[in-house]
Amino acid sequence: MRKKNYKGRCEKRSVPKCEGICKTYDTLQSRLVDILSEDDAVKEIRCNVLMEDTDYTSDIVCIMNDDTLVVYECCYRHLIKRPTTARLLQQSREFWLGHGIKEEDWRLAVDAEK
């Protein structure tokens, strides 16, 4: 999750399953986009999707071949215990569950343990 007007460094690139330019803000988000673009079950990928009535965006929203939505939030392992991170992740989860996403279709992508 990021602020909707995040001013940090981003990588702009073209991804086959993403309309227009895909903007990724860190290596975790970029790698997840690569993995999802190779997945045959994914029909479309959307990056940095604005959550209405909030100042934040969800990292990745996928439309699967059966037209269900799957939401991915990217989080680094060392940040996951922070109260602010937990609050924002909970806010994202509640937002998407309120918009018809199933519990198992809201997912958290975490970097590998070192």
Q: What is the role of each PLM region?
A:
Residues 1-114:
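Electrostatic, structured charged patches in enzyme active sites and in nucleic-acid/phosphate-binding
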